[in-house]
């Protein structure tokens, strides 16, 4: 069976195959079928080759397959919430990687705090200490490389201030914000729920998705995006800080241009 024609397989021909993917996305099923039927080693390089050749014949289905693997890994497999299967995770994302390297995630790294708060990004992360995070919605659409959108909604629980350094920083925020006091964040009142929405759209520079997006050396899918991050909370006083404090309100809505995200680990993870 030729690689470039695997994306044209009718779904009925796959009905008797056992596949590891929990998603019903036909592209993921076809990818599993290809490696199983042809007894091809499931390596990152072979996965990239499979996608790159498929992209040359059916761009829409290949991109939707890549997006579906991203969704499956985060929403179905609950990669951010569940304890890691370290062997599987290391094969897909790398031996020195952690959940903070998964895109998206709610951490100083995942929220690009270093670009918003250079020099104090770690302290800001402690001010909004993350206790849990969960992907609750994942939507995507693709028409062409100038018209696509991925939106991922995470819910989090957190605590305002988790050490002496972050407490001092909070006090400096409070000193410049009327209507909020330190007592608003003591005891149980320090706990909060939040919503973080990551929106990925075509980059505004000249980078475009193409066959070169699928690279064999090193094996990667370097997908170009502009990223918008929106954060909100139901905590009344924290919401006041997010609305009025000059430093804190930077977190509320931020846009990052010229980003690239390697989506190969998600595709590979779904096939392992």
From Swiss-Prot:
Keyword Aminoacyl-tRNA synthetase included in the entry's annotation: no
Entry keywords, A to Z: Cell membrane, Lipoprotein, Membrane, Palmitate, Signal
InterPro entries the UniProt entry points to: Lipoprotein_3 (IPR001595)
Membrane topology summary: Lipid-anchor
Pfam families, A to Z: Lipoprotein_3
Cited PROSITE patterns: PROKAR_LIPOPROTEIN
Lipid-attached positions, S-diacylglycerol cysteine: 21
Record's GO cellular component terms: plasma membrane
Lipid attachment points (N-palmitoyl cysteine): 21
Cleavable signal peptide: 1-20
Highest taxon of the lineage: Bacteria
Subcellular location per the Swiss-Prot or TrEMBL entry: Cell membrane
Keyword Membrane: yes
UniProt similarity note: Belongs to the MG439/MG440 family.
Stated name of the protein: Uncharacterized lipoprotein MG439
Species, as recorded: Mycoplasma genitalium (strain ATCC 33530 / DSM 19775 / NCTC 10195 / G37)
């Amino acid at each position: 069976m030729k690689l470039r024609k695997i994306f044209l397989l009718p779904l009925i021909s796959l009905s008797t195959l056992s596949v590891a993917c929990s998603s019903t996305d036909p592209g993921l099923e076809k990818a599993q079928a290809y490696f199983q039927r042809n007894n091809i080693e499931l390596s990152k390089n072979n996965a990239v080759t499979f996608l790159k050749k498929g992209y040359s014949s059916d761009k829409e289905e290949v991109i939707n397959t890549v997006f579906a693997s991203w969704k499956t890994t985060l929403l179905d497999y609950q990669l951010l919430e569940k304890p890691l299967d370290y062997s599987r995770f290391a094969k897909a994302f790398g031996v020195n990687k952690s959940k903070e390297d998964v895109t998206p995630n709610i951490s100083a790294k995942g929220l690009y705090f270093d670009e918003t708060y250079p020099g104090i990004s770690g302290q800001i992360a402690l001010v909004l200490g993350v206790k849990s995070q969960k992907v609750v919605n994942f939507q995507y659409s693709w028409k062409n490389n100038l018209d696509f959108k991925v939106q991922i909604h995470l819910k989090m629980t957190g605590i305002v201030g988790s050490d002496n350094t972050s407490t001092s920083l909070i006090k400096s925020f409070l000193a410049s914000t009327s209507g909020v006091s330190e007592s608003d964040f003591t005891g149980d009142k320090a706990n909060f729920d939040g919503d973080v929405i990551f929106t990925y759209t075509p980059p505004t520079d000249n980078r475009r998705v193409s066959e070169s997006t699928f690279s064999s050396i090193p094996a990667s899918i370097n997908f170009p995006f502009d990223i918008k991050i929106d954060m909100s909370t139901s905590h009344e006083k924290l919401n006041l800080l997010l609305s009025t404090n000059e430093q804190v309100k930077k977190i509320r809505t931020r846009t990052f241009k010229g980003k690239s995200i390697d989506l190969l680990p998600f595709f590979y993870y779904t096939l392992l």
